């Protein structure tokens, strides 16, 4: 494994600590260990598989090192989710929190975009094909 200056790991730790504090929570040892492992894997360009239980703080555990990496390297990071529920949690709760913490700790607020696949958008062709239906028919439960 490669080595990075201690201040980089400290920035990641400070960012995580600030974000967790802003959410009214406390760091968990597993969350800190995960953030450190993600940080190291990104720097060494390695794959990493993490398994952790519900409530471990996985989202902030990977977002903190990802943001430090983005700011430090000027790189982009892609976070893909398996569910729309997790995507919404990230987009509306975890990412805004980590970005607020980033302004305080890193003096930067990286740009973030939420991208969705075509299955999450209306198909204009299909929408037009349903125009013969009345609104109550389309909206009936």
Kindly give the residue locations of the regions a language model identified.
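Walker A/P-loop NTP-binding motif
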Residues: 60-73, 96
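Proline-centered helix-kink/hinge sites
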Residues: 65, 135-136
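Generic, well-ordered alpha-helical scaffold segments in large soluble proteins
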Residues: 37, 41, 66-69, 101
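Conserved structured core elements
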Residues: 28-32, 54-60, 80, 88-92, ...
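Conserved pre-motif I regulatory segment
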Residues: 5-49
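Walker A/P-loop
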Residues: 44-62
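Short, surface-exposed connector motifs at secondary-structure boundaries
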Residues: 44-48, 73-78
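A substrate-engagement module of RecA-like helicase motors
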Residues: 2-20, 74-133, 140
């Amino acid at each position: 494994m490669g080595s990075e200056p201690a201040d980089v790991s400290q920035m990641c730790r400070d960012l995580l600590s600030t974000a967790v504090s802003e959410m009214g929570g406390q760091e968990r040892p597993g969350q800190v260990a995960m953030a450190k492992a993600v940080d190291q894997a990104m720097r060494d360009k390695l794959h990493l598989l993490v398994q952790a239980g519900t409530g471990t703080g996985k989202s902030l555990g990977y977002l903190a090192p990802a943001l430090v990496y983005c700011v430090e390297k000027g790189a982009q990071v892609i976070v893909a989710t398996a569910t729309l529920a997790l995507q919404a949690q990230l987009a509306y709760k975890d990412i805004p929190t980590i970005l607020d913490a980033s302004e305080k700790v890193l003096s930067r607020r990286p740009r973030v975009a939420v991208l969705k696949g075509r299955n999450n958008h209306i198909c204009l062709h299909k929408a037009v094909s349903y125009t013969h239906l009345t609104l109550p028919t389309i909206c009936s439960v």
